[in-house]
């Protein structure tokens, strides 16, 4: 089963050439990644989803969610012996797709959060990428008025929030 999911994740990564894909496609690729992490962490970390949009009807930057979920596992939850939780939510607010990825991990102090946001801003300007900087830069290019915001509190977890104005319709699949 693990090999099947790993192969599927590789295929998703290799065949996705477009800058924007449907949320449905993004979630499909994310499922394989989550499965592999569930095996790695022996099910200690639960992932819940609350998707209140038609995933095939909205566009997101390709490879937007996996780095955020990866950060939740790697930085927020990995060291928690009692396990943890990641909650992925999506909804429409006016004509804006709002997505949040929240974890109940170790969180960050105000100083740590400030350092992360500084790194993101620097990577946006230089083009030298850290994962979140790459995502933020692509949101700025693809979604005028789009945003990525990070909220965190030490001992309580982190939330990454995306706001993506939906001005285009997904193309029909061939």
Question: Can you say where each PLM-predicted feature lies in the sequence?
Answer:
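C-terminal end segment of the histidine kinase catalytic
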Residues: 148-174
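Two-component histidine phosphotransfer core
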Residues: 1-149, 159-161
């Amino acid at each position: 089963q693990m090999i099947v999911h790993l192969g599927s994740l590789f295929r998703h990564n290799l065949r996705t050439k477009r800058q924007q894909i449907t949320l449905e496609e993004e979630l499909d690729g994310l499922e394989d990644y989550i499965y592999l992490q569930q095996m790695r962490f022996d099910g200690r970390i639960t992932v819940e989803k609350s998707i209140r949009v038609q995933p095939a009807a909205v566009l997101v930057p390709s490879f937007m969610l996996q780095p955020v979920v990866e950060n939740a596992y790697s930085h927020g939850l990995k060291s928690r012996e009692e396990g943890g939780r990641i909650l992925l939510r999506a909804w429409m607010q006016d004509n804006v797709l709002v997505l949040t990825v929240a974890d109940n991990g170790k969180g960050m102090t105000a100083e740590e959060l400030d350092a992360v946001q500084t790194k993101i801003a620097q990577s946006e300007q230089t083009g030298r990428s850290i994962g979140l900087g790459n995502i933020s830069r692509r949101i700025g290019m693809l979604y005028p008025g789009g945003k990525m915001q990070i909220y965190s509190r030490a001992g309580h977890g982190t939330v990454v929030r995306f706001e993506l104005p939906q001005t285009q319709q997904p193309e029909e699949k061939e």
